[in-house]
Amino acid sequence: MIFLDTSFLVNDEIQLCLKKTVDGNREKNWLPAYHFAICDKQGKEMGTCDLRIGHNLSTYYGGNIGYRIQEEYRGHHYAQKACLLLFELAKKHNMDHLIITCNPDNYASRKTCEYVGCHLVEIVELPEDNNMRLEDGETEKCIYQIELRGS
C-alpha cells in the first residue's frame, strides 16, 4: 500500500501531525496504519489517533479508527474533530465505510461516534481468542459504522 500525503489534515482548531506509518502484517492480521498526534494550531500535542486502512476481523472488533485525548484537553470535541479529518484520508484510500469501536461503558467515546454520524451496529462479546480480551481483559465492544460514500 502507498501511504498518502497527510498535510491536508487540518481544520480551524486542530491539525493531525503524522508520527509514523506502519505497514500491514498478514501473519498478525494487522492492516497498514497511520499514527498521528492531535495537535493545536501551535503544534502542542493534545492526544493521539490512528487510521487503519482496509477491513478484516481485527478491525471489526478493534475499529479502523482509534483515538485518545489527554485528560486536560477532554470536553472540547477534539476526538470528533480528528475523526472527521480521518474520514477524509480514508476516502482518499477509497474506503466506503469505517468501523469505530469502544467499550460499552465509555460514554464519551460513544457520544463521539454518534456526533460524527456513526450508527451503532451491535454490542458484541469479544471472542475468547481476541487480543483485547486476552491482553486487556476486555469482554465487550460497541461496534459503530459510518458510510463514507455520499458524505
Segment roles from a protein language model:
Residues 3-60:
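Acetyl-CoA-dependent GNAT
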Residues 33-35, 137-143:
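Short hydrophobic/aromatic beta-strand or adjacent loop that forms the aromatic wall/cage
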Residues 67-69, 75-89, 111-115:
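Conserved acetyl-CoA-binding loop-helix of GNAT-fold acetyltransferases
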Residues 37, 50, 64, 68, ...:
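Conserved beta-strand segments that form the floor/walls of ligand-binding pockets within enzyme
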Residues 105-122:
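Conserved active-site alpha-helix within GNAT-family acetyltransferase domains
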Residues 19-22, 144-151:
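Short beta-strand-to-coil "C-cap" segments at the C-terminal boundary of structured domains/repeats
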Residues 91-101:
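Conserved GNAT acetyl-CoA-binding A-motif
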Residues 101, 119-135:
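Conserved catalytic-core motifs of GNAT/GCN5-like acyltransferases
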